[in-house]
Design a protein with these regions (language model features):
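TOPRIM fold recognition
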Residues: 1-4, 146
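Conserved inter-motif catalytic segment of the P-loop NTP-binding fold
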Residues: 85-148
């Protein structure tokens, strides 16, 4: 049973969700395909999404730029190695802290690291600069963008 609306689930529905979500040591689970590695360590599998959090000025943006460039090029960039299926190559990059000029610089950096021209948008990279919106609007925009 997949929850598809924002209604508060009943106690019965919650019990079903808990049963579906229970992980057992006795069950064999299918491993998702590995699509992103740093050197020999797995950091991403198909079907997952990630957020980068950390202290201010801790190089989060540069790190995520390198990961995004690797995914965009579907190759190795600064020790990050990507191997995405052809039909799973769209990258959604959401920045909620930086203004549009800074986001544009990050976008150009990603394109450059991926070996692409930094003066042409890529069909496989969607960058959203959401700083100007309220937290509630950001949440709604993120939810909608994930359906792209």
């Amino acid at each position: 049973m997949e929850k598809t609306n924002n209604n508060i689930p009943s106690a019965e529905e919650l019990a079903i969700y808990i049963k579906e979500a229970t992980v057992s040591v006795n069950t064999k689970y299918e491993q998702s395909p590995v699509v992103l590695m740093v050197d020999d360590s797995i950091i991403g599998t198909l079907g997952n999404f990630s957020a980068s959090i950390g202290k201010a000025k801790s190089k989060k943006t540069f790190n995520v730029s390198a990961i995004a460039a690797s995914a965009l090029a579907n190759s190795t960039v600064l020790h990050y190695r990507s191997s995405f299926p052809e039909n799973k190559r769209t990258i959604l990059y959401i920045d909620t802290e930086q203004g549009e000029p800074h986001c544009q610089k990050v976008l150009q950096r990603i394109l450059c690291l991926a070996g692409l021209p930094k003066n042409a948008d890529s069909d496989n990279l969607i960058m959203l600069g959401l700083r100007k919106y309220s937290p509630e609007m950001i949440f709604d925009l993120e939810q909608d963008a994930l359906c792209i």
